[in-house]
Amino acid sequence: FPYTFRYGRTGGLYELTRQNINSKNVVTRLYVYGGSSNLGDKYRYTRLCLPGKAKNASYIEDAAAIAAYGLKENTKIFDDIRPERYGEVTAAGSAYYAFKDATMNFDLNEKDSAGNTKWLIDGATAKVKFTTGNLAGYEFDIHKYDHATKEIQVVPFTDENGMKFPSETSAAFQFGVGDKYFFTDINLPDTYKTDAENKLLAEGNKAITEYSQPQVQYGLSIDENFIRQFAGELTVVNLFAVGDYIPVEDEDIGVNKSVRITAFTRDLLREYKYNITLGDSV
């Protein structure tokens, strides 16, 4: 709905009444972590952390909520946020089990000054997993990478039905130009970790904004003339529906969010007269 309803500031246009406030599950300090893949053994924790934060400092807090409700801690893990490099098949490889990716911007075989591999992990097999194309959802061990030609060779496998992937003969189960994939079980360059950490921070900020506010329930009665300016003359169709979200601001208890419509009644004779119940719980 294109309007924010503010508690205590109606101007005669609507009445927003508090029906229930539950601060039991409020979180004012949220520890935030990401996934555990592609970090390497030199990363500061087994899971992705917030930018520049060690394990025990990987949290976001809301000072205003702490002042109102005290320090209340919880943890949120975003398993799907991790360093990832999404690549693309740009050309066929030298064999049915190979493909080329001209966008590859680091040498998978690179070693440091001590002769240790920088991106391959000891004891782990690097893999590619496809997200689009005929082999979407399939994961393959990497057999060989040639940085000069940007060719990746994978290890074919045979499933329980005797089907071989990728197929040597059927184009329906082969790599295709434009197919998307990503690496797993490798140590990606730091730029990918930085990107993932920033994404984790953004999602963490969204989460603390939600968790630091109490669970609420409101009753909302809106003036008919106020409704009419939004609905026009389309009185047959309901302007509101259960499951819609309406922006609510209640400064006294720190609420500034969209709250779900859990129920409403509409007068059959006065098409613009609505009584709405808003709540965080269904």
Task: Show which residues each predicted segment covers.
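An acidic/polar, Gly/Ser/Thr-rich interaction patch typically located in mid-to-C-terminal regions
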Residues: 9-282
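Short, conserved phosphate-binding/catalytic loop or strand-edge motifs used
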Residues: 1
